[in-house]
């Protein structure tokens, strides 16, 4: 028979476990301290980098996106406060505040024909038209950052993804799965017809018409019934290039 460890053996084992635990805690603390020191060094280097390349960050969209990525990697948010160090150094807070105001204006001006749902690409095109005289170009990444800041206003602005498109919603319309599937189908031509939706999604005509009627009521769709085949086209400005130029000069 194997002899069980005595009291002395148990005490030695417990002491060894305590030593390993203390050693592990010391190693973890050392690693944490080293990481904090490295992050502090990175932040200092990032501040110096920002001072040196201030104009590039403001004027060059690609450079600005890379700068934001660098900040995110070390937990720095240049947009966290308009009165913060980064906002004062770069004026980034003002840039995104002005962009946010322009986004609201574009969404309001185009709401009558898209129902408050506009593709991110179209929104950027409108903004570029408005800012042609400015030297600060605007990218989709800039728009996404500005919209994320609008959420604090409780204004209902939200970015949703349907199929391959990102859409900006500026009204509190709730889209269900059926609505999203129809919008995804419409991305091909900008419109759908009832029979096509029935065939592609294996739905009943009642289900298709019910979903389309809701989208019409919300102002997200438009009916075109002037075709020789007698089939109504349900157009969706938010995914149709046909309507992308509407309001661009406003």
From Swiss-Prot:
Signal peptide positions (record): none
Compartment(s) where it occurs, according to its Swiss-Prot or TrEMBL record: Endosome
Species annotation: Arabidopsis thaliana
Lineage top rank: taxon: Eukaryota
Subunit structure: Component of the endosomal sorting complex required for transport II (ESCRT-II), composed of VPS22, VPS25 and VPS36.
GO terms under biological process: multivesicular body sorting pathway; protein transport
Role according to the record: Component of the endosomal sorting complex required for transport II (ESCRT-II), which is required for multivesicular body (MVB) formation and sorting of endosomal cargo proteins into MVBs. The ESCRT-II complex is probably involved in the recruitment of the ESCRT-III complex.
Lineage: Eukaryota, Viridiplantae, Streptophyta, Embryophyta, Tracheophyta
Matching Pfam families: EAP30
GO CC terms: ESCRT II complex
UniProt keyword terms in alphabetical order: Coiled coil, Endosome, Protein transport, Transport
PANTHER family, per the entry: EAP30 SUBUNIT OF ELL COMPLEX (PTHR12806), VACUOLAR-SORTING PROTEIN SNF8 (PTHR12806:SF0)
Coiled coil spans: 35-55
Protein's UniProt name: Vacuolar protein sorting-associated protein 22 homolog 1
Gene name linked to the record: VP22-1
Record-stated family: Belongs to the SNF8 family.
């Amino acid at each position: 028979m194997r002899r069980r460890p005595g009291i002395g053996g148990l005490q030695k084992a417990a002491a060894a476990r305590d030593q390993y635990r203390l050693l592990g805690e010391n190693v973890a603390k050392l690693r944490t301290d080293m990481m904090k020191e490295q992050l502090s060094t990175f932040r200092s280097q990032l501040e110096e980098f920002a001072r040196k390349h201030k104009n590039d960050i403001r004027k060059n969209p690609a450079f600005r996106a890379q700068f934001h990525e660098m900040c995110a990697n070390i937990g720095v948010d240049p947009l966290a406060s308009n009165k913060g160090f980064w906002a004062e150094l770069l004026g980034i807070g003002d840039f995104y505040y002005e962009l946010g105001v322009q986004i609201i204006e574009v969404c309001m001006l185009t709401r009558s024909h898209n129902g408050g749902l506009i593709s991110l690409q179209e929104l950027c095109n409108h903004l570029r038209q408005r800012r042609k005289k400015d030297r600060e170009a605007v990218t989709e990444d800039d728009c996404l950052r500005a919209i994320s800041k609008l959420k604090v206003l409780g204004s209902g602005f939200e970015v949703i993804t349907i199929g391959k498109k990102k859409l900006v919603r500026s009204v509190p319309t709730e889209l269900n799965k059926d609505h999203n599937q129809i919008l995804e189908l419409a991305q091909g031509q900008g419109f759908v017809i009832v029979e096509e939706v029935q065939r592609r999604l294996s739905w009943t005509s009642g289900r298709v018409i019910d979903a389309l009627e809701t989208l019409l009521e919300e102002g997200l769709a438009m009916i075109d019934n002037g075709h020789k085949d007698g089939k109504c086209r349900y157009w969706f400005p938010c995914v149709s290039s046909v309507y992308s130029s509407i309001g661009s000069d406003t």
